[in-house]
Every structure is written in structure tokens, then in C-alpha cells.
Amino acid sequence: MKNIEKYRNLIAKGEVDALLLTSKHNRMYAAEYCVAEGVSVICKEESYYFTDFRYIEAAQKNLPGFTVVMTDADHPYTKLINDAIAAHTVKTLGFEDDSLTVEEYTLYNTKLNAVLHPYSAEINAPRQSKEP
């Protein structure tokens, strides 16, 4: 099973509509590739990876199964995340409450058009067991 499917299985439980992955460890696990900077949103049917111009080419080349979108001054992470969650009617967004700073949480909580649901334990769980 691809790692991204493990995260989709979490969404299928019905506690959240999508996942917001901000930590490098979980972004790398979901994508099965390391992009130095970015944010990922995992929805039931589609996965998004948002990054800036420095990493966009590598992300587009190495993240099959993700819709890769470039951030810039006119298209900050919060706007792009809102576009993605609106396209999938996301009301509740599970996030990594153990790794966001207060500043990041405040930004996402005030700018995103979804209720943030602390979900670190569930998001981290797939990384805790190795597959052969």
C-alpha cells in the first residue's frame, strides 16, 4: 500500500475531511520523496503539494499522484489550501498539533475556511510501523 493511501484511510474514518501536512517527516512519508519546503493537503480523491519556485520543478517531477502548485506573493499557502479544500467541500481539516508553532496555528486558524482538528497521533501512526 502506498503511503498516501494510509493517510486516505485515516480520512475514511470520518473524523476529518482532509489532512494538512506541514512537518517535513510526514510530507516526506506521504509523498515518498523529500521536498525541502512545502505544505501538503490530502483529500479523499486528490492530494496537493504546495511549494515555492525553488522546489517546484523537483516536486512536479518526483511527486506523481500529487497536484503540485507553486506558491508566491499573490498565491500564499493559505489561499492555495483554501482553493483545494473548497474544491473538495472540506469542512474539517486534521492537522499536526504537535509540530505547528503558535504563530502557524494562528495563521491557519484565522485564514483557512475549515475547522482545524488536532490529529497528530493519527497522522504520525502510519510512520510508526515498517512494511517489508
Identify the role of each PLM range.
Residues 2, 76-132:
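Flexible, acidic/His-enriched mid-domain "rim/lid" segments that flank
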Residues 1-83:
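N-terminal accessory/capping or targeting/presequence segment of soluble
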